[in-house]
C-alpha cells in the first residue's frame, strides 16, 4: 500500500512538473495488456464515481445497499466531506491460512489469464489504464500516460512497438464522448457544491452535525442511487444533471432553513 501511495505521489509531482506525456484523443501510445492481473491486486485506491456505480449496479442488477455490502466501502472524504465509494478488495489466502495480499472482487481467471468479470461495466480508472484524465476548465481534455516501469504490458509494447490510439483504447468515440460529458458535469459539481453550502462548517459544528448527516444521506442518494436502471448511458447523464440540480436546491434550502441555528452560507 505504501508503494502504491508513493507511486501516486510521484505521478502527481511529475504531472505538476510537466514530466508526464500528455495525449489528445487521436494520439498514440505504447501499451499492450497481457492479462497478468497485477493492476487488480493489493490496492485501496479504486474510487467509483457515480457513472461507474450506475453501470456496475445495472450490470449486477443490485440495489445500492446490496452492491455496497458485497463489493464496496462507503465512506466520507476527509477533505471533500462528500459521500465516496471505492472497491473493497478481498484477502488472498495461502494454503496455510496466511493472507498474502488482496485482489479485486471482479477479477476472474481462465486458463492462466486474468480478466474482469464486469468487463462491459468496468470503472473508468480500470478501463482507461494506463491513461489518466486531465481536464482544465475551458480546455480540451487531455490524457496522461502513467507507467511505473514494472507493468508487463508496457514492457511488451515497448519491446514489440505495439501502439494504441487513445480514443480506441477508451472504447471508441461515442463512449469517450459520454465519459467527457460526465466528467464535465461531475467537475462542475465538485467545483461548486461548496458555493451552495458551507459543508466544512456543517461537518465540524456540533450543533449542525445532525444536519450534516441528513445532507450527506441526501447527497449519497442523489449521486449514487436515484436513477432509472433501465435507461442507457445517455439517460443516466440526463438524470445525473437533474440530481446535481437537486443537491444545489436542497443545499440552499438547508442554509436558509437552519439559519437561526448556524450560519451555513458559503465562505466568501
Regions found by a protein language model. Give the residues of each.
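Short loop/turn segments that flank or connect secondary-structure elements
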Residues: 1-268
